[in-house]
Amino acid sequence: MEYHLRVLQPFARDPAYYASVKTEESDTPAEEGPTIHGAVRLWHYPIWPRTVLDTVAALTPAQAAELAAGLRTVAPLLEQARGNLAGSDARDLWVGGVRAFEEQVEALDALATRVRARNPREGELAAAIAEARGATARLAGWLREEAPKRTGPSGIGTAQYSWYLRHVLLVPLTWEEEVTITRRELARAHASLRLEEQRNRARPPLAAAATPEAYRALQDSSIARYLAWLRETDVLTVEPWMERALRERMHPFAPEGRRNFFFQGNHRDPLPLWTHLWHWWDNARIRLTPHPSPIRRGPLLYNVWMSRAEGGATVMEEYMMHMGLYDGSPRSREIVWIMLMNRAARGLGNLYAHANVLDMAQAGDIHV
């Protein structure tokens, strides 16, 4: 906490910190990065489905009252934000903040539409949504006007980053050492991909699913294959809730030309992504099989998940590959190496942005 108050200061530097209407559940037990207290998490309410397996449903009167009370905090919060941010000169954070509040406007518009359709008599909730939307739109406009005036760096610098690693995250590395490790991982993944391509040179390339039906069938079969392999190899205990936790994160079909980096691989073999989604098993375990001790029942107060969750999910991609998950589909190993190359490159982009070597737009070009 002391480091956040003294150095990071999201409440004084980062406009996006005040975007308090959250639309998507975090894939870690505790949200990554600073999250403002009192955030309104829409997926806690049936009007906003938490997963692709859930459907929109009407709010009870108690739920509507609770949601309205949460949304009524938005306008005073954003009014206070203007004063709190007055001394911030972090240009990239201001530019990024504009989009954060544009997205909050879009979310509140969608929420208003759903409430009109399913809770038309909840006038107080509708009024609270309108008030929050107006305040959000006004702050977005103010940020657009102010952003060009903010010209300072947004990264905290290498010295502060190293201190954060060592004394807050308890990772015994410096910024420079993380750069060295990440560059080495990028080179290792790149070389491994070339070896894999040479090994598979006589094999046909993986074909991408060309229709929604084919993509759904591909995802269904890959989940079944993954869970069956875990049982057969005794890698871990397969719990009854694990299949649903994966199915909750199934993606819609994307036609060729609209597939992002991850969809390019996922439309050929979704298994590498399912191995990465270890994240959601962490979440489901905490939610569905709570620890008997109240101290260990929820996310730890020390947010170890900021490093553990993504690191663990990424390493699972390679662990499962080396244990034989793709023995029947050698070309899928190429997807794993490509994904690992991407994650290493993204890591370098993040490190260089914190060091103010790259701005956020340049780092974003790497981030995918």
Label each PLM-derived region with a short phrase.
Residues 1-368:
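N-terminal maturation segment of proteins
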